[in-house]
Amino acid sequence: MNNPSETSKPSMESGDSNTGTQTNGLDFQKQPVPVGGAISTAQAQAFLGHLHQVQLAGTSLQAAAQSLNVQSKSNEESGDSQQPSQPSQQPSVQAAIPQTQLMLAGGQITGLTLTPAQQQLLLQQAQAQAQLLAAAVQQHSASQQHSAAGATISASAATPMTQIPLSQPIQIAQDLQQLQQLQQQNLNLQQFVLGHPTTNLQPAQFIISQTPQGQQGLLQAQNLLTQLPQQSQANLLQSQPSITLTSQPATPTRTIAATPIQTLPQSQSTPKRIDTPSLEEPSDLEELEQFAKTFKQRRIKLGFTQGDVGLAMGKLYGNDFSQTTISRFEALNLSFKNMCKLKPLLEKWLNDAENLSSDSALCSPSALNSPGLGVEGLNRRRKKRTSIETNIRVALEKSFLENQKPTSEEITMIADQLNMEKEVIRVWFCNRRQKEKRINPPSSGGTSSSPIKAIFPSPTSLVGTTPSLVTSSAATTLTVNPVLPLTSAAVTNLSVTGTTDTTSNNTATVISTAPPASSAVTSPSLSPSPSASGSTSEVSSASETSTTQTTSTPLSSPLGTSQVMVTASGLQTAAAAALQGAAQLPANASLAAMAAAAGLNPGLMAPSQFAAGGALLSLNPGTLGGALSPALMSNSTLATIQALASGGSLPITSLDATGNLVFGNAGGAPNIVTAPLFLNPQNLSLLTSNPVSLVSAAAASAGNSGPVASLHATSTSAESIQNSLFTVASASGAASTTTTASKAQ
């Protein structure tokens, strides 16, 4: 009986032109490696018959444990020449052929496919070992003889594979078609392997692979089917799958990966396509960032806004873009894809705009009707926003405080001094005036809403038993603090400071206020007057009294009918004096409002005591640091004098022979007047006929031995005391001398 291996050797040596196909679910092709041993036709038919029993369902093979009995009769006579150390080349043929097991290889046991990384590794290995396999075929075609007694299925492609060619024609086209249909039903099951383990032979591997390109597999796989007729090859071409039986040598020396040739350039080109964007993307991002920065600078230089760019692009190129889109492009807040789309359009518009500004030409006929794209439009562009430096702004603020509305010549002078444009200075002053109106809006009555600040000095203690009412050794402060708003003029600040001259004898302190002319008058005597000119009182005393008038910063507008509160330091019994002129208060003002304005308790004053149109003079006790609320009354002739001692009201002790009312402190004597005394010039003849002298009774009884204090209220008319002169003086001499002086006035 002829040995099938002997008949296949000549065909293997000269059968390079014979082609075969190999298929598996992983789309791999393996270079054929011829072996000396071959299987008989009966073995192949039994092998193929067993394929019909394989049930491919789900992710596992139902016939994984089924065995395949292959009847093989090998009469190799050349086994005597093989080395005894090689169990695979023993001359004796075992009587019982072990069964072959059908199993899944590798990841197919769990129904998984090879990952792309594994496929790429196999591709690289196949490319590296392609030439080595070709050399191995030529070297071992004439010498190798192996007995393919058993085979084991494996999905590992990391070892070199040798193929066992079929010596007899086999009609397997229909079987492979069924196999393809079964594999299409279960895509996860890519391949299966037949294994034939033996006790004394290294297991050989049989891989049945399926490739989608059967035609190329026939051209590439050689020495597979040596004696396959043309009909069988045609059936293989039509059905596309092919079969490859490979065996693993006992001592593998190299690794091999078999892949289809046509998938190799695709697999190699795919990483290139993936890597290319990653390599080019950084450069594109840098280019986009640079273009966005350049675009913004050139756009601002041309005088176009982001909204203008969006409208111009819509009219020129038909793509409307909003101002937000242009802003996001400049800020690199758009996606990479959108920025790549927008970049060429913006670049084209920028070039066209620069050509328009430089050459004064139109780049497109549609630009004729586009406002702002022609030469005239460029000239009509709004100017760049002016940024004023800090030092220039400070100088402008100083000029604004001096003159809020300068003339054109003054604006030109300021612009020349600051090296600025005249139009910029003019606009700044206009905007500054509007800002001032927002900060200090004018009221309907034209009054100022800024309050008048009150300043009080530290109090100077005074002995309560001293008959002198005024003793001052330091500068005193006149404080104005309106409770009701001034309606006649806008008074920003009023501060009157009084100083006294100290002599060896008694001194007198006079603070005279002329509201329309000055805001502060300082004098050694106390003489408030609301008249237009400051008035100075002459006090008859043994010592000379000097009068000084000091005018501070003039008011921006006449004080008019304002109210002044005078606080003199060193006063304890009469801590403060509120002096006022004619104030603008409605005639129907309530008593409570006037009393609250005067800082008095409304319960102390009856409505009958307030005649229509009266002026209020309030002397309210308290410490020097306390703030007395001034009273703003209507322009009336009422004079209210409230004199309160630190321990109670001053009692009325006597009236002199001339009809003057004398207030005096009788020491521990009981107080006669327990409530404030109100003197109405319309009802009391004391204020209409003669001046009123308030003299301390204790000082009057002392005669010339001590100084006395007197308050002179001189009325210039019988109906009104609006222009009255109030004098508080500390003079030396007897009470009769003071009374005589009052009569002389």
Swiss-Prot record:
<feature type="modified residue" description="Phosphoserine">
    <location>
        <position position="283"/>
    </location>
</feature>
<feature type="modified residue" description="Phosphoserine">
    <location>
        <position position="450"/>
    </location>
</feature>
<feature type="region of interest" description="Disordered">
    <location>
        <begin position="497"/>
        <end position="559"/>
    </location>
</feature>
<keyword id="KW-0804">Transcription</keyword>
<keyword id="KW-0597">Phosphoprotein</keyword>
<keyword id="KW-0238">DNA-binding</keyword>
<comment type="function">
    <text>Transcription factor that binds to the octamer motif (5'-ATTTGCAT-3') and activates the promoters of the genes for some small nuclear RNAs (snRNA) and of genes such as those for histone H2B and immunoglobulins. Modulates transcription transactivation by NR3C1, AR and PGR.</text>
</comment>
<keyword id="KW-0010">Activator</keyword>
<dbReference type="InterPro" id="IPR050255">
    <property type="entry name" value="POU_domain_TF"/>
</dbReference>
<protein>
    <recommendedName>
        <fullName>POU domain, class 2, transcription factor 1</fullName>
    </recommendedName>
</protein>
<dbReference type="GO" id="GO:0000978">
    <property type="term" value="F:RNA polymerase II cis-regulatory region sequence-specific DNA binding"/>
</dbReference>
<feature type="modified residue" description="Phosphoserine">
    <location>
        <position position="387"/>
    </location>
</feature>
<dbReference type="InterPro" id="IPR045703">
    <property type="entry name" value="POU2F1_C"/>
</dbReference>
<dbReference type="InterPro" id="IPR010982">
    <property type="entry name" value="Lambda_DNA-bd_dom_sf"/>
</dbReference>
<dbReference type="InterPro" id="IPR001356">
    <property type="entry name" value="HD"/>
</dbReference>
<feature type="modified residue" description="Phosphothreonine">
    <location>
        <position position="276"/>
    </location>
</feature>
<comment type="similarity">
    <text>Belongs to the POU transcription factor family. Class-2 subfamily.</text>
</comment>
<dbReference type="InterPro" id="IPR017970">
    <property type="entry name" value="Homeobox_CS"/>
</dbReference>
<dbReference type="InterPro" id="IPR009057">
    <property type="entry name" value="Homeodomain-like_sf"/>
</dbReference>
<feature type="compositionally biased region" description="Low complexity">
    <location>
        <begin position="81"/>
        <end position="95"/>
    </location>
</feature>
<dbReference type="GO" id="GO:0045892">
    <property type="term" value="P:negative regulation of DNA-templated transcription"/>
</dbReference>
<dbReference type="GO" id="GO:0043565">
    <property type="term" value="F:sequence-specific DNA binding"/>
</dbReference>
<comment type="subunit">
    <text>Interacts with POU2AF1; the interaction increases POU2F1 transactivation activity. Interacts with NR3C1, AR, PGR and HCFC1.</text>
</comment>
<feature type="region of interest" description="Disordered">
    <location>
        <begin position="67"/>
        <end position="95"/>
    </location>
</feature>
<feature type="modified residue" description="Phosphothreonine">
    <location>
        <position position="270"/>
    </location>
</feature>
<feature type="region of interest" description="Disordered">
    <location>
        <begin position="1"/>
        <end position="34"/>
    </location>
</feature>
<keyword id="KW-0805">Transcription regulation</keyword>
<dbReference type="InterPro" id="IPR000972">
    <property type="entry name" value="TF_octamer"/>
</dbReference>
<dbReference type="GO" id="GO:0005634">
    <property type="term" value="C:nucleus"/>
</dbReference>
<keyword id="KW-0539">Nucleus</keyword>
<dbReference type="GO" id="GO:0006357">
    <property type="term" value="P:regulation of transcription by RNA polymerase II"/>
</dbReference>
<dbReference type="Pfam" id="PF00046">
    <property type="entry name" value="Homeodomain"/>
</dbReference>
<keyword id="KW-0371">Homeobox</keyword>
<feature type="domain" description="POU-specific">
    <location>
        <begin position="280"/>
        <end position="354"/>
    </location>
</feature>
<dbReference type="Pfam" id="PF00157">
    <property type="entry name" value="Pou"/>
</dbReference>
<dbReference type="InterPro" id="IPR013847">
    <property type="entry name" value="POU"/>
</dbReference>
<feature type="compositionally biased region" description="Polar residues">
    <location>
        <begin position="1"/>
        <end position="26"/>
    </location>
</feature>
<dbReference type="InterPro" id="IPR000327">
    <property type="entry name" value="POU_dom"/>
</dbReference>
<dbReference type="Pfam" id="PF19536">
    <property type="entry name" value="POU2F1_C"/>
</dbReference>
<dbReference type="GO" id="GO:0000981">
    <property type="term" value="F:DNA-binding transcription factor activity, RNA polymerase II-specific"/>
</dbReference>
<feature type="DNA-binding region" description="Homeobox">
    <location>
        <begin position="381"/>
        <end position="440"/>
    </location>
</feature>
